[in-house]
Amino acid sequence: MVLSLILQLSTLWPACRADFTPTAPLASYPQPWLGAHPAAVVTPGINVTLTCRAPQSAWRFALFKSGLVTPLLLRDVSVELAEFFLEEVTPAQGGSYHCRYRKTDWGPGVWSQPSNVLELLVTDQLPRPSLVALPGPVVAPGANVSLRCAGRIPGMSFALYRVGVATPLQYIDSVQPWADFLLIGTHTPGTYCCYYHTPSAPYVLSQRSQPLVISFEGSGSLDYTQGNLIRLGLAGMVLICLGIIVTCDWHSRSSAFDGLLPQQN
């Protein structure tokens, strides 16, 4: 009796899940596109809308988050797109999202192919970028050098700064998670750092990169030699002063000693 009941329930289980569990999609069911407004990188407390757009009219849309088996949200519509609203997002709502859609004339449990994966990042500050010199931080005098500022998120705006200068030297909007800044001519040597941020409001700024020193070939050894000469010169002056003090002290002691000797008649 118990075994029979278990078998009956097991046959009903797929039917219960068929309406919301995507099956292996067929090639004839093209994938939708998933986007975020105002951006995929936002600060906490912002309202975010995820839009799932299908290439054809659909009946039901489903939004999925990585790590969850069932849809996070469902929307029943009769057009090509559905909007999923995430109110006052928190860092915990960040993650990987994708969406699917289905039509009324599709079989039970048949969903479209999954959309592109959208990475939603909710943070007050973006991770620190790296700054490297290509081909290297030591270049021939007058040669050009390229500085690559690399973050972790594509589609950001990058700014290159020179230490001691308040305004950015160069500014680049990049579709890649990095940007290359070209430094030309004799003004290349110096210390540089970079930032990146979201290209539109609400702006989220990264931490500053570690400073990078660019120098010409031979300038480091020349500075080192000059430093040694300065140190040797100071040491020589100290020795001369000590010698003068010792000599003066010896003369004063000698004169005092002569004064103590008895005078001969």
From Swiss-Prot:
Q: Which UniProt keywords apply?
A: Cell membrane, Disulfide bond, Glycoprotein, Immunoglobulin domain, Membrane, Receptor, Repeat, Signal, Transmembrane, Transmembrane helix
Q: Which residues form the Ig-like domain?
A: 22-115, 125-218
Q: Which family does it belong to?
A: Belongs to the leukocyte receptor complex/polymeric immunoglobulin receptor (PIR/LRC) family.
Q: Which InterPro entries match?
A: Ig-like_dom_sf, Ig-like_fold, Ig-like_Receptors_ImmuneReg
The chain's Extracellular topological domains, given as residue ranges, are 19-231
State the protein's name.
Osteoclast-associated immunoglobulin-like receptor
Q: What does this protein do?
A: Regulator of osteoclastogenesis which plays an important bone-specific function in osteoclast differentiation.
GO: which molecular function terms?
collagen receptor activity
Where does it sit, as one GO cellular component term?
A: plasma membrane
**Cytoplasmic membrane side:** 249-265
Q: Give the intrachain disulfide bonds.
A: C52-C99
Task: Tell me one GO biological process term.
Answer: Fc-gamma receptor signaling pathway
Pfam families listed in its UniProt record: Ig_2
The superkingdom of the source organism is Eukaryota
Q: Which PANTHER family match?
A: MHC CLASS I NK CELL RECEPTOR, OSTEOCLAST-ASSOCIATED IMMUNOGLOBULIN-LIKE RECEPTOR
Q: Could you tell me the membrane topology recorded for this protein?
A: Single-pass type I membrane protein
User: Has keyword Disulfide bond?
Assistant: yes
State which tissues express it: Specifically expressed in preosteoclasts or mature osteoclasts.
Task: Provide the glycosylation site positions.
Answer: N47, N144
